[in-house]
From Swiss-Prot:
It comes from the Bacteria. One of its GO terms (molecular function) is tRNA binding. The lineage of its organism: Bacteria, Pseudomonadati, Pseudomonadota, Gammaproteobacteria, Alteromonadales. Its EC number is 3.1.1.29. It catalyses: an N-acyl-L-alpha-aminoacyl-tRNA + H2O = an N-acyl-L-amino acid + a tRNA + H(+). This is Peptidyl-tRNA hydrolase. Keywords: Cytoplasm, Hydrolase, RNA-binding, tRNA-binding. HAMAP family: Pept_tRNA_hydro_bact.
Length: 195
């Protein structure tokens, strides 16, 4: 059985960033909140937007840090420490340059892959990397010098539709994760690709 107690969607705060590729993790958490019929509300104690949701009968905290991306760990650690949630009970959703739009993957552990949000979470959790990730493909601009502008830019409509489809499939796979296990959830999600 899955023991996820905290689901985090990484993002930059503010309306100007809401539709940028870097906020893909937040889109996933917003969709989970919508399905659970709960509202994400600002909570200064945890430096983010939070909600308590029942997903497939499981009591889960949802969190979108309202720090900037490179300070995400401050928010995640504050909530995890308060509720005594272990890294292995956390799922962090984030944008992934190394996967094309329309693809999403679950993963346990590993490095930060240059993602500043993951980097800060690992640092603030005492270098513990053993949390789950949901990697949401956003594609790569093809030149590492263009990455910053790319992740902070909006995707064209065709790419956005593919990302939305992958997020919808990730939500369905999350339900399998809670009802069954991570292996079955991975099997479902990893065989999906939006055309």
């Amino acid at each position: 059985m899955c023991d996820i107690k905290l689901i985090v969607g990484l993002a930059n705060p503010g309306a100007e960033y809401a539709q940028t590729r870097h906020n893909a993790g937040a889109w996933y958490v917003e969709e989970l909140a919508r399905i659970a019929n709960v509202s994400l509300a600002p909570d200064p104690k945890y430096f983010g937007l939070t909600a308590r949701a029942i997903l497939c009968g499981k009591d889960v905290r949802l969190l979108i840090p309202s720090t900037f991306m490179n300070l995400s760990g401050k928010s995640v650690a504050a909530l995890a420490n308060f509720f005594r949630i272990e890294p292995e009970q956390i799922l962090v959703a984030h944008d992934e340059l190394d996967m094309e739009p329309g693809v999403a993957r679950f993963k346990l552990g590993g490095g930060h892959g240059g993602h500043n949000g993951l980097k800060d979470i690992i640092a603030k959790m005492g270098n513990n990397k053993n949390f789950y990730r949901l990697r949401i493909g956003i594609g790569h601009p093809g030149d590492k010098n263009k990455v910053s502008g790319y992740v902070l830019g909006k995707a064209p409509a065709t790419e956005q539709e593919k990302m939305n489809a992958a997020i919808d499939e990730a939500v369905r796979s999350t339900e399998i994760l809670f009802k069954q296990d991570m292996t079955k959830a991975m099997h479902r999600l990893h065989s999906f690709k939006a055309e």
